[in-house]
Amino acid sequence: MSSQYDDDSRDRSECKSKSPTVLSSYCIDSILGRRSPCKVRQLGAQSLPAPVRPDHEMTTEVTSKENSFDSDMHLPPKLRRLYGPGGKYLDSGRGFHEHLEKGERERLLDQACESLKISQAPQVSISRSKSYRENAPFSQSDEGQSPEHMAQELVELSTLKFEEDVVKEEACGDNSLSPKDEESLHNDGDVKDGEDSVCLSAGSDSEEGMLKRKQRRYRTTFTSYQLEELERAFQKTHYPDVFTREELAMRLDLTEARVQVWFQNRRAKWRKREKAGVQAHPTGLPFPGPLAAAHPLSHYLEGGPFPPHPHPALESAWTAAAAAAAAFPGLAPPPNSSALPPATPLGLGTFLGTAMFRHPAFIGPTFGRLFSSMGPLTSASTAAALLRQTAPPVESPVQPSAALPEPPSSSSSTAADRRASSIAALRLKAKEHSAQLTQLNILPSGTAGKEVC
């Protein structure tokens, strides 16, 4: 009876030593590179000689392991303490025997630790390799054990092999990172070299800058004769070729580079004036000669003699304005008059503003300022003339003596009055002008038709 009870207690101890919690702790220890107490205990027990180990332990080892995995897997840890492998409740004498078994296990564990002299290494790779080397002779000495124990040793060897693969992968990762580290170190060296080179280049640039400052070229002072010749060449072409520039340089005692720079600056100046709208034509105002000299806007538009060959678009616009003026002889000056009277209420300036400056030739940036300046002047002069007029000019034909030009000071005084007048006065004049226009439209058209015929 006592021998049977001892066998049951041994089976229970084997079951408890092979519980899943102990196996999980072994897995954790194998990952961390340490030996688990269960493994050390097994190795200590296996290292004992065969005559010392009891025979019933050899026979019941396989059955105890099977019972442990069948009975304890579905029970929680607290119930495993109370129930045995067959599901039966344990008696009160179990605690005493368990205490004895626990003391014996601790003694065997101390002996095994002293015999094996296990020391935990700080590096994981070294501890894993050491554990693999230390496990190799034990696996060779366990060849005479049971097949299930051999299978367990194979599982342990496979886990160790997996750990070695992990160590190799880590070593490969270290090798893959080491070129990057070398490259980063090399880049750091390059950066330092680059900084030194930057410092050297900065010093060279400063030296070159000092040389350039010493060799600075002063501004070229052109004489009046040189400027006249250059302006004459610029009137011929804005983009002279290299032969023309060299010829000018030879004739004016200059270098070709100075001539080229002067033409560049002159073109920039000309483009700036053209964009501003001040420069209308290189030679003067695009109007016929006698009319351009006495036009009220001639001083504002930098008037001058008209070129002998005007633009065909300007000619067509001028002919259209002349035809419109000839259609109303009472409203336009006679052909023999040589100037535009500012006092004419609906004179040639009105037709110029309506017919000529609506021509497509004047739609551009060059004449933008011309429109903005001419519009208010013509409207103000027309309004002032309508206010000064007492009777409509359509009823009586205009004589040549009545169309004599006023002095040029009248146009400038009218412009000065317009600038000095306030916004309210301008609005009042505009209202009166619109009233006069309505009165002209109310007049019977029969007389006007007879005069036109």
UniProtKB/Swiss-Prot annotation:
SMART domains linked to this entry: HOX
CDD domains per the UniProt record, alphabetical: homeodomain
Listed PROSITE patterns: HOMEOBOX_1, HOMEOBOX_2, OAR
Main location class: nucleus
Protein name: Aristaless-related homeobox protein
Motif range (OAR): 421-434
Source organism superkingdom: Eukaryota
Biased composition (Low complexity): 401-418
Stored InterPro entries: HD (IPR001356), Homeobox_CS (IPR017970), Homeodomain-like_sf (IPR009057), OAR_dom (IPR003654), Paired_Homeobox_TFs (IPR050649)
Localisation per UniProt entry: Nucleus
Recorded GO MF terms: DNA-binding transcription factor activity, RNA polymerase II-specific; RNA polymerase II transcription regulatory region sequence-specific DNA binding
A GO biological-process term: thalamus development
Higher taxonomy: Eukaryota, Metazoa, Chordata, Craniata, Vertebrata
Gene name as annotated: arx
An annotated GO cellular component: nucleus
Basic and acidic residues composition bias: residue spans: 7-17, 53-75, 179-195
